A protein has these predicted regions:
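A well-structured
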Residues: 1-267, 551-555
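A sensor for short, sequence-defined functional sites
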Residues: 72, 76, 80, 90, ...
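C-terminal, non-catalytic "cap/extension" segments appended to globular domains
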Residues: 91, 97-109, 202, 220, ...
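Catalytic zinc-binding patch centered on the HExxH motif and its immediate surroundings
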Residues: 206, 270-272, 306-327
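Active-site recognition of the HExxH zinc-binding catalytic motif
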Residues: 207, 335-357, 376, 381, ...
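Long, K/E/R/D-enriched contiguous segments that form extended
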Residues: 250-290, 297, 319, 353, ...
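Short pre-active-site segment immediately N-terminal to the catalytic Zn-binding motif
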Residues: 269-274, 324-345
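Helical catalytic core of nucleic-acid polymerases
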Residues: 354-403
Length: 555
């Protein structure tokens, strides 16, 4: 690629340009493969020194490679419009990648400046974020259950936040925040640096209008669309407050505590073995599409699932789609709780999405962030329908529907309020506010979110330092709200149209990252700039609550 630099002129013939673009693509593929190997190894055990050393060395190598190839991006961004459009027209599957480079043109710096930023990230903020992961992954938690004190990982502890016993739920949350609060000075300082780094680069150097505007531009979403989504979510906080009032009556509580919002309605939660969970998820996909189920099976056939919790293992769950043609890798922490089954369905949905887009270049393979949750949330809904279809007991059906609403709250309103907090946090840190002031602001936002429907305990003011997305990917979480409300609309169409819906759904997934979210969804008849579209998702949620209100309260 460097050898061809002298050929990069505004009048370069299209075949020569495409040959250089192909080399650029090969470099990107090798970089992704190496980076993925290091991250997957690190995820197995975040305390593994060999994995840490490899990741650190690779970071340096990949930054150096990125900096050597940086001239290509900058040259293309700097072309006159007519010359750039001529090359875009001949670029085939890479078209949207090149259009995206042009979209970022106003926010791009000179080549020496971009090199400095890449080096700064690798040795600065990226290292700090890795430090956050290392610190939090080694936390252990002590919880007394039935007279026995258990030593737990965070994922194991969180299972007790859905325990049938109110005192166990409360103790689990209190222990979570006790440990994080004890480390809050360090964790909040890391977040402070994350915000200041973002502000320095995105506002002072690149001149985005607002901190969130940088993420919106990367997502190819206008600020106005994201603001509309967030304000519609905010104005519908009462929908979930209504649900929490209903759930309090079901649990025979005068008022729901924040400890109780994910409480099961039954005193004995059903447990699942991993094999049983896999069978259920695959069966739900098979009922929808044999092709989709076949893609999901590849993850298991190729042993690309790491499901067992263990000390040092990265918490949570993710799916890593590395390259077109490679079966994605999935990490979960399966503890046998009912919630772990839809988590598996969710991550398999991501894997299916990646495999559906395998015909694309590595440069246009990954779905844009706003659409990245489409197949994952859709997979959860397919699983719910399967479980409801197999269950005739009205009490169990009610519990399943309540579980859906619990998860919908967690995916829609909770995530929207996370982003609303981030918007404020970036402003407050820029104004020099303290950690305690940030925590107080977060707690006040929780009060707005829950209203008078939920009693808040003081320790929840520290919830924000537990949210890894704030550290890893600022302003990420509205994508969950976007994805869930979008899927509610798509799933309504699937129920109405049956098999006729499949080609349209497949097309959305098969686009990968080869077109803008607005373009992909417009082909499905969806206008993401219309507040009525987002309100329609809340109307579906409200209708589900109405259905539940018509059921008898469990005795």
């Amino acid at each position: 690629l460097v050898a061809g630099r002298s050929r990069l002129t505004p009048d370069i013939p299209a075949p020569e340009f495409l040959s250089l673009l192909e080399t650029y693509e090969r470099i990107a593929a090798i970089s992704r493969r190496l980076g993925a190997y290091a991250y997957l190894w690190f995820s197995e055990d975040t305390q593994n020194q060999a994995a840490l050393n490899l990741q650190g060395r690779l970071d340096q190598v990949l930054v150096a490679a990125h900096n050597r190839a940086l001239f290509f991006d900058l040259w293309f961004k700097g072309l006159p419009d007519e010359a750039a459009q001529r090359l875009i027209e001949s670029s085939g599957d890479e078209r949207y990648f090149l259009e995206s480079l042009r979209r970022l043109r106003p926010f791009t710096l000179s080549e020496p400046e971009e090199r400095v930023i890449a080096l700064k990230d690798a040795n600065g903020i990226d290292a700090l974020v890795n430090l956050y992961d290392m610190l939090t992954s080694q936390y252990s938690f002590a919880l007394q259950v039935e007279g026995e004190t258990k030593t737990l990982t965070q994922d194991e502890l969180m299972a007790y936040c859905r325990h049938p016993a109110p005192e166990v739920r409360a103790a689990a949350y209190q222990e979570l925040y006790r440990v994080y609060r004890a480390n809050s000075t360090v964790l909040a300082q890391i977040y402070n640096h994350r915000v200041r780094d973002w502000h320095a680069e995105m506002l002072e150097l690149r001149h985005f209008a607002e901190p969130i505007s940088a993420r919106n531009t990367m997502n190819d979403l206008p600020d106005a669309v994201v603001n509309t989504l967030l304000e519609v979510c905010r104005s519908n906080a009462g929908v979930f407050q209504r649900y929490f009032g209903l759930k309090a009556r079901w649990l025979n509580l005068g008022k729901l505590r924040r400890y109780d919002i994910y409480a099961p309605l039954s005193p004995s939660e059903k447990r699942y073995g991993l094999d049983e969970a896999v069978d259920l998820v695959l069966a739900s996909l098979e009922d929808f599409s044999r092709e989709v189920a076949g893609l999901a099976r590849r993850v298991f056939d190729e042993q690309h699932l790491d499901a067992t919790p263990r000390p040092g293992k990265r918490g949570g769950a993710y799916c890593y789609g590395v390259l077109p043609g490679l079966t994605p890798w999935i990490l979960t922490n399966f503890t046998g709780r009912a919630r772990d089954v839809p988590t598996l369905a969710h991550e398999l949905g991501h894997a299916v999405h990646a495999m559906m887009a395998a015909d694309h270049s590595v440069l246009t393979y990954n779905a844009p962030l706003p659409l990245a949750e489409t197949a994952s949330v859709f997979g959860e809904m397919l699983l719910t329908d399967l479980l409801l279809g197999r269950e005739s007991d009205p009490t169990v059906r009610r519990e399943l529907l309540a579980s859906v609403l619990d998860d919908t709250y967690a995916t829609v309103l909770r995530q929207a309020y996370f982003t609303l907090f981030e918007r404020d946090a970036h402003r407050l840190i820029d104004e020099g506010k303290t950690i305690e002031e940030l925590a107080s602001h977060y707690f006040a936002a929780l009060g707005e979110q829950f209203g008078s429907a939920v009693e808040l305990s003081d320790e929840f003011r520290w919830e924000w330092i537990v949210v890894p997305h704030f550290y890893h990917t600022p302003f990420y979480t509205y994508a969950y709200s976007f994805g869930q409300l979008l899927v509610l609309a798509l799933y309504q169409r699937y129920r109405a149209e049956g098999e006729a819906f499949l080609p349209r759904y497949r097309k959305i997934l098969a686009y990968g990252g080869s077109a803008s979210p607005a373009h992909i969804l417009a082909e499905a008849g969806i206008d993401i700039g219309d507040p009525g579209f987002w309100q329609g998702g809340f109307d579906v949620i409200s209708g589900l609550i109405t259905d539940l209100e018509g059921l008898e309260v469990p005795s």
